[in-house]
């Protein structure tokens, strides 16, 4: 998860009342200008600018820190954005919070090997690292990965709407999406 981009540098590190965390996203937000204006009116600020544009990942992080917990913050993201956003957060305790967008458009895959769990958007990243696919997150599902177990923080919703372009345009050819290649 995350992108290589001149306009959306990732990961970014945030220090907030939730603690320090790093965040990466795969997002397409169509109401970013409205959200930016709303956050600025709440005396929030944006530090990650490139080509005079707001970094989507920073905007997502600012929506997250409006919550009392990471789960509440991620649900705040789902509530406010138009579009989709899947994300990974690396927390201070070394655990990873993985969240799939509420429509299930972009994949989040959990892999496991002895003594470790990992999350990715492309299952093809696992074999060379000796991981096996453990599961695919459902729409809106949130989990927390520790080295020896995974805790579900939010159950998946209904109505998977995976992006069909994965199979044709931008998905990696050797990756599996929802168990299909």
Label each PLM-derived region with a short phrase.
Residues 1-138, 144-181:
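Conserved short alpha-helical segments that host acidic/polar catalytic motifs at enzyme active sites
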